Amino acid sequence: MANVTLFDQTGKEAGQVVLNDAVFGIEPNESVVFDVIISQRASLRQGTHAVKNRSAVSGGGRKPWRQKGTGRARQGSIRSPQWRGGGVVFGPTPRSYGYKLPQKVRRLALKSVYSEKVAENKFVAVDALSFTAPKTAEFAKVLAALSIDSKVLVILEEGNEFAALSARNLPNVKVATATTASVLDIANSDKLLVTQAAISKIEEVLA
């Protein structure tokens, strides 16, 4: 079992927290992490691209000239693809780029990125993040007290709304809960700031 130092929100040591090796101490599987990140990035694509095919463009219902006798090539519509202003052939249509991976793969990727952060000493555990009201300045003081000045993902327990509201407006700070933190967010962050309650929830879900 791995031990990490537990801090309070003033930056003082408040003891040790024992992490479950089944979640935070595995050998990271880089290929699985890669696959999940590609999947999550694909899901972020809007997919709203669209063009008009010959049935969608305006006009072109009448045959421009008779079939025979003019000496010109036969045409059925001025909105055929070979005409200027005609419909596009096989153009992009709105669609979702997202696809799902098996749950076991997604869970292995989560455990891999968590384990990597712990191994690299980029995992900061805090006993609680308690605020009586949303105060961005107060959360900035917490980060300063914990010597966190780089891109950080704050992982909270469910229902800690004041902490989430206090953190969300700070630059380089992203907020998630124990159940919504994604592999992409964790991998993109320089450090993780995780509450003790969130650690328990992560272990409950992934162990």
UniProtKB/Swiss-Prot annotation:
What Pfam family is a match, any one?
A: Ribosomal_L4
Q: Which GO terms describe its molecular function?
A: rRNA binding; structural constituent of ribosome
Q: Which UniProt keywords apply?
A: Ribonucleoprotein, Ribosomal protein, RNA-binding, rRNA-binding
NCBIfam families hit by this protein: rplD_bact (TIGR03953)
Subunit info here reads:
Part of the 50S ribosomal subunit.
Q: Which family does it belong to?
A: Belongs to the universal ribosomal protein uL4 family.
Q: What is the protein's given name?
A: Large ribosomal subunit protein uL4
Q: Which organism is it from?
A: Streptococcus pneumoniae serotype 19F (strain G54)
Native organism taxonomy: Bacteria, Bacillati, Bacillota, Bacilli, Lactobacillales
